[in-house]
């Protein structure tokens, strides 16, 4: 669910910092509670992937297809698939290119659902609801 928030930079530039900080804190808490088995690797590379994806998402915010920022939903899918897929392949194996593709594919599927099935409707609802839109003014 939280991955749907990776599209919030479409609405306001400050969301780049927000989603990046949220990712960092979640990864940090996950390490300390034992929930994040990738550990420091994910704190550094996962957060960097989120920042990169958020910046790209912001850059593509005005590219629309039938009013939806479809292009802006692509960077979180691709960047997280590559980075988190590599983390998972390194940590759990198999440490082969095929292993990486398998891990990256799994991450991409989850990201596709989060960004396209949840994130795009979330952006649409915020943009169409005056009370919500007021929270996301530039």
Indicate residue ranges for each PLM-predicted region.
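Hydrophobic transmembrane alpha-helices
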Residues: 1-21
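Membrane-embedded alpha-helical hairpins and interfacial helices in multi-pass inner-membrane proteins
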Residues: 4, 24-138
């Amino acid at each position: 669910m939280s991955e749907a928030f990776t599209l919030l930079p479409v609405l306001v530039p400050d969301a780049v910092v927000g989603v990046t900080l949220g990712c960092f804190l979640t990864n940090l808490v996950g390490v300390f509670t034992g929930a994040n088995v990738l550990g420091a690797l994910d704190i550094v590379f996962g957060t960097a992937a989120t920042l990169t994806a958020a910046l790209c998402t912001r850059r593509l915010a005005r590219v629309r297809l039938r009013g939806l920022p479809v292009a802006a939903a692509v960077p979180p899918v691709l960047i997280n698939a590559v980075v988190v897929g590599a983390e998972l392949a390194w940590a759990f194996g198999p440490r082969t290119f095929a292993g990486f593709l398998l891990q990256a594919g799994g991450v991409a599927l989850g990201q596709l659902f989060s960004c396209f099935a949840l994130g795009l409707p979330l952006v649409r609802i915020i943009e169409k609801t005056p009370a919500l839109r007021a929270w996301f003014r530039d």
